[in-house]
């Protein structure tokens, strides 16, 4: 399968809301997340609400490139980030906020390409992310150069999360 990456503005991401919800529902419905479909709506709406208020919102989408004119190309993956202080304890730091790949497109290098594209386009310096504290996720990010710097259980969550840093 071939794919292409496209940089998305916040406005473009908002226009693709329904596609993003469908993608997140597919990806987060299974292991290790096991989120209900409404979780995808909440995730996307929270991300887009924040995106439109940020000057440094950065996002890439991966589309199937099998169609020569890319008309109606399927959304295979998405990544977004911005500079924030939420995970750093007050120091403005670029945060990888969301990385999602459709289950049928996982294992093809799409997630890594999205990840790398975002980090190149994002603010220079170290970056942070927060993800579930499960080997399936932490091992992947460790292979990609991230290190666990904190473990926590935010708010009303029943699951443990890690904060990871990449220099």
Predicted regions and their residues:
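Conserved N-terminal entry element of GNAT/NAT acetyltransferase domains
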Residues: 1-18, 22, 26
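Active-site rim helix/loop that mediates acceptor-substrate recognition in acyltransferases
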Residues: 34-68
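Conserved acetyl-CoA binding element of GNAT-fold acetyltransferases
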Residues: 89-103, 129
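Conserved acetyl-CoA-binding loop-helix of GNAT-fold acetyltransferases
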Residues: 101, 107-120, 142-143
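Conserved GNAT acetyl-CoA-binding A-motif
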Residues: 120-133
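Conserved catalytic-core motifs of GNAT/GCN5-like acyltransferases
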Residues: 128-130, 142-163
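Conserved beta-strand in the GNAT
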Residues: 59-61, 70-84, 95, 100
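Helix-loop element at the rim of GNAT/NAT acetyltransferase active sites that forms part
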Residues: 21-38
């Amino acid at each position: 399968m071939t794919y292409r990456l496209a940089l998305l503005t916040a406005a473009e991401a908002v226009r693709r809301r329904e596609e993003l919800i469908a993608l997140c529902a597919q990806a987060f419905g299974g292991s290790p997340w096991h989120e209900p479909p409404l979780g995808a709506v909440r995730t996307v709406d929270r991300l887009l609400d924040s995106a439109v208020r940020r000057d440094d919102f950065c996002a890439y989408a991966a589309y199937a490139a099998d169609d020569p004119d890319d008309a109606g190309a399927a959304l295979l993956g998405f990544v977004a980030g911005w500079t924030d202080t939420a995970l750093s304890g007050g120091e403005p730091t670029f945060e990888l906020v969301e990385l999602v790949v459709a289950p049928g497109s996982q294992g093809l290098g799409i997630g890594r390409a999205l990840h790398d594209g975002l980090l190149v386009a994002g603010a220079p310096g170290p970056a942070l992310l927060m993800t579930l504290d499960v080997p399936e996720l932490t091992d992947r990010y460790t292979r990609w150069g991230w290190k666990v710097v904190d473990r926590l259980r935010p708010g009303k969550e029943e699951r443990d999360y890690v904060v990871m840093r990449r220099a």
